[in-house]
Amino acid sequence: MAAKKYSAGVKEYRQTYWTPEYVPLDTDLLACFKITPQPGVDREEAAAAVAAESSTGTWTTVWTDLLTDMDYYKGRAYRIEDVPGDDECFYAFIAYPIDLFEEGSVVNVFTSLVGNVFGFKAVRALRLEDVRFPIAYVKTCGGPPHGIQVERDMMNKYGRPMLGCTIKPKLGLSGKNYGRAVYECLRGGLDFTKDDENINSQPFMRWRQRFDFVMEAIHKAEAETGERKGHYLNVTAPTPEEMYKRAEYAKEIGAPIIMHDYITGGFTANTGLANWCRDNGVLLHIHRAMHAVLDRHPKHGIHFRVLAKILRLSGGDHLHTGTVVGKLEGDRAATLGWIDLLREQFVPEDRSRGIMFDQDWGSMPGVFAVASGGIHVWHMPALVTIFGDDSVLQFGGGTLGHPWGNAAGAHANRVALEACVQARNEGRDVEREGKEILTAAAAHSPELKIAMETWKEIKFEFDTVDKLDVAHK
């Protein structure tokens, strides 16, 4: 075979990176992008440009291409599809050889897939809709420190969703008053309480004060109720060294679970903390603060299903997923899709839920889906139906806003949850019969009755901004 010769100049991307005849390998990492090209840029060229800029390409031919096997290492745009109901954009499917990515590094994956390519002038908007991580790559990642079953065994809680609460006000409480709020919620019937995502170590409450008062509250509530209790102690910090210092102290005082803001804190920090939690027997709750900056626009950014997959690889035992019924953005079908991607071992392609590829997680443990944001007792039937048992239902204002106080709010939520779980186990349609189920339970629980009266008119009926494209058909 004649040796390839270097020929300087600029070629159209499609000449190298548009390969419609390519059949993806089981070891390829596959990505689906939604591309809105600039006027005058055709689909094949735009798709090839994204494949090039997210893998081996640059704007001109370079002689060093001849020093490696470009045909092996390049990304390949292999399929284009219409976006239902939108003529401006299209789906581009791109295959990347696994050797483009460092083993076990979600940071390296994102640096390629959502790096400079998102500022590329040939596209007006670009969104990463889904990624298929090959099982060969999944096996290089640590994943959740413990997973669903191990957490249930550690906390001795089975057969129902867990109940939680974010302490409010989220900022401004002293350590002692914060601990008191935690105690009231836990003794009332909750399994967990939680630091809000922006509680770190501010002047009004330094982290060590909070940790000490919270653990005092946990021990007291456990002694009174005979149940295991926990509080998500947020160890997110300005530096990794400080983060580990806080995590070590939490372990020292007996905390069963800590918390990290995985997007603002960074994927490197999150993976390191997940490894530490695995080695030290501490559960890890993950908050998704900043996700909507990346995932809310329907044409530009990163879809949350990708952020959820990245978190499962990076490591976390819980992840906030939205509620569908609460105050935060969330399409029902899409939410059900990424809940499955967090918990199941194998998730097949399902366009009705926005899942573009089969995803095999092998033996990687699952992640608890956390429903939080503007929910109260009236939402309980829908939440139990949507999220199932392997979830944490967190009622912040829906606990602390009870007219009789935190303990009464917690008690109301526990009674509502157990009534819905019992009805479901009896074969009833919990979502359809929710009002009847809750009303019957409230006859024996004045706390639930008052909660139902307090929040009977509270609804969040704004339309979802980021709808599934299938819904536009």
Curated annotation (Swiss-Prot):
One Gene Ontology term of the biological-process aspect is: reductive pentose-phosphate cycle
PROSITE patterns tied to this protein = RUBISCO_LARGE
* Cofactor binding note from Swiss-Prot or TrEMBL: Binds 1 Mg(2+) ion per subunit.
Q: Where does Mg(2+) bind?
A: 194, 196-197
User: One MF term from GO for this chain?
Assistant: ribulose-bisphosphate carboxylase activity
Cofactor dependency: Mg(2+)
| CDD domains the record matches | RuBisCO_large_I
Q: Which InterPro entries match?
A: RuBisCO, RuBisCo_large_chain_AS, RuBisCO_lsu_C, RuBisCO_lsu_C_sf, RuBisCO_lsu_fd_N, RuBisCO_lsu_N_sf, RuBisCO_lsuI
Q: Which Gene3D superfamilies match?
A: Ribulose bisphosphate carboxylase, large subunit, C-terminal domain, RuBisCO large subunit, N-terminal domain
Disulfide linkages recorded for this protein, renumbered to the chain, are none
Pfam families listed in its UniProt record: RuBisCO_large, RuBisCO_large_N
* Entry EC number(s): 4.1.1.39
* Residues with the N6-carboxylysine modification: 194
Q: Which reaction does it catalyse?
A: 2 (2R)-3-phosphoglycerate + 2 H(+) = D-ribulose 1,5-bisphosphate + CO2 + H2O; D-ribulose 1,5-bisphosphate + O2 = 2-phosphoglycolate + (2R)-3-phosphoglycerate + 2 H(+)
Q: Which UniProt keywords apply?
A: Calvin cycle, Carbon dioxide fixation, Lyase, Magnesium, Metal-binding, Monooxygenase, Oxidoreductase
- Tell me, in a sentence or two, what this protein's role is: RuBisCO catalyzes two reactions: the carboxylation of D-ribulose 1,5-bisphosphate, the primary event in carbon dioxide fixation, as well as the oxidative fragmentation of the pentose substrate. Both reactions occur simultaneously and in competition at the same active site.
Q: Which PANTHER family match?
A: RIBULOSE BISPHOSPHATE CARBOXYLASE, RIBULOSE BISPHOSPHATE CARBOXYLASE LARGE CHAIN
Q: Anything else of interest in the record?
A: The basic functional RuBisCO is composed of a large chain homodimer in a 'head-to-tail' conformation. In form I RuBisCO this homodimer is arranged in a barrel-like tetramer with the small subunits forming a tetrameric 'cap' on each end of the 'barrel'.
Q: State the name under which the record lists this protein.
A: Ribulose bisphosphate carboxylase large chain
